[in-house]
Amino acid sequence: MEEKPRLIDSFLFRAALIFVLLLPVLLRRDLTPTNEMKYLEIADEALRDGHFWCLFHNGEMYADKPPLYIWIVMLFRRLLGCHCAFLLELFSLVPAIVTLWVLERWCSEELSSRWRAAASLSLMTCAWFLGSAIVLRMDMLMTMFITLSLWTFWKMYTGRATPADRWLFPLYVFLAIFSKGPVGIMIPLLCIPVFLLFERRFRFMGTVWGWRSWLLLAALCGIWWFFVWREGGSEYLNNLLFHQTAGRAVNAFHHKEPVYYYCYTVWYAMAPWSLIAIPVAFLPLFKRVEASPMVRFLLAVAASFFVIMSLVSGKIAVYLLPIFGPLCFASCILLQRMEDGGSRTAVILRRIMLWGSLLILAAAFVIGLFFPGWLNSLL
């Protein structure tokens, strides 16, 4: 017997609900001095000194991040004459909602509306995902572009891509790089071939990473690096390309952690839904449930990126943000297959994920409305 559709099953309703419940948090919290205020200061310094491609903080080079997010801060500073934290926070919240929409649209052929609701709300309320959706950082922007690139790859892989998708794929990859740096290319370049190897279709790499992808990526990066060199000279370009990439990967000068760091941080970074998503992700290994090609791809991306980032010297929990979506949605597809097979446990878990997520969002509303000081201490 089919269940009647509910209001919560509508993506537009869920998106509006997320926005309304997080609105007090967005309006009443204070900006953090270590990261958020620093980005505003970098934007002010760039506007004052006429820098556009090269970033500086208190006169010192700040090649840690590409300029895209700072450009957004600069744009609103120029338009409004002051910084508006609420508008800037939307450039984290809106990409988070777009990421949910992409994953729901992508997985709609394997997930019912009820399971899509559970998957997207549980992803939204993962600790680090929710936190990244309300702070002034570029991580969610990068996650959105990575998710778009993965969806575009899947359309190419399954023969559903339009001619434009062959150009959109490298464009999304570039925008991910331009948002956060080299971590933006790691999933499309390193994790996709892992999946293709397991599927014995490695030759498809020539279609995904063919001449169009490399041409557009080289052209856009070349333009960026040329203007960086023109404005900041060889020293800034060297800092951007080598010190901030190879230095962080091999012998990090910031956030250096042991190789097993993510083995324990992933549990609280995805909390509370790591307790469901991660164990369920291992079920196909034990033949408890069959994994479709889509699930295999999502899990291959999550597993390979986890291993790759564990081998990188510099580690922060938020670096795992791009794999939260694949993990949550893959686990929900597996749970729905179990429910279709008569599993009562899967039904219970779906309800826990749905109502637990709504409870977390309601708690965020109350805290933002009545206890903003406590929220500031958390961030």
Where do the language-model regions lie?
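Membrane-integral, polyisoprenol-dependent glycosyltransferases
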Residues: 1-344, 371
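Transmembrane helical bundles and short interhelical boundary loops of multi-pass, membrane-embedded
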Residues: 347-379
